[in-house]
A protein has these predicted regions:
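Conserved active-site tyrosine of GNAT-family acetyltransferases
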Residues: 40-45, 107, 138
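Vicinal oxygen chelate
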Residues: 15-28, 50-134, 146-148
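Acidic, Ala/Val/Gly-enriched low-complexity intrinsically disordered segments
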Residues: 5, 9-10, 14-17
Length: 148
C-alpha cells in the first residue's frame, strides 16, 4: 500500500527551496468546536492551564505557545473548512513536559478518565509515551511525553 512508507520513513519535500524549513515554519493554531463555552472553557483551563482569550469577538484557548481557536454556539467564523469542524470530531495531541505517569496523575486528580495508555506512539519528535482522554464534547485528546 502506498501509505506504508509513512510508517518507516520521512518523505522528502519535492520543493528544492528549503528556506521555509530553515525559517522554522510552525503550526500557529488549530480549530476545535464546542457545544457549551462555559463547560469547555473550564475544562481547558483546568486540564491544560489554558488562557481563555477573546479575539475579534471569538474565543481562543492559549496553551503555552499554541492556540486553539474555538467555534461554538453563536459563532459565525469568516472562513470555514470545506467540512467544518463539529463538537467531538477533532483529535489533538499536546506534549507533556514530564514523565507520562505525572500526566496520568494530573488527569485523574481532576476526575478525567484515561481512555487508553500509557502506550508508545510516534509524535513530532519521534517515539514517545502517550495517554488518551476526551474533552466534554468527545474530542480525542492525547498527551505525549518524550521524557526517558
Amino acid at each position: 500500500m502506498w501509505h506504508s512508507a509513512f510508517r518507516t520513513a520521512v518523505i522528502p519535500s519535492v520543493d528544492s527551496d528549503t528556506r521555509l524549513y530553515r525559517a522554522g515554519v510552525r503550526l500557529d493554531h488549530v480549530v476545535i468546536a464546542v457545544s457549551d463555552f462555559e463547560r469547555s472553557n473550564a475544562f481547558y483551563r483546568v486540564v491544560f492551564g489554558a488562557e481563555v482569550v477573546a479575539i475579534d469577538g471569538r474565543v481562543a484557548y492559549r496553551v503555552g505557545e499554541q492556540q486553539l481557536n474555538v467555534h461554538g454556539p453563536g459563532t459565525r467564523p469568516a472562513m470555514l473548512a470545506r467540512i467544518p469542524v463539529a463538537p467531538g470530531n477533532s483529535d489533538l495531541c499536546f506534549e507533556w513536559p514530564g514523565a507520562i505517569e505525572e500526566a496520568v496523575e494530573h488527569l485523574r486528580a481532576r476526575g478525567i478518565r484515561v481512555e487508553a495508555g500509557p502506550m508508545t506512539r510516534g509524535g513530532a519528535k519521534g517515539p514517545g509515551t502517550s495517554v488518551y482522554f476526551r474533552d466534554p464534547d468527545g474530542t480525542l485528546l492525547e498527551l505525549i511525553s518524550y521524557a526517558s
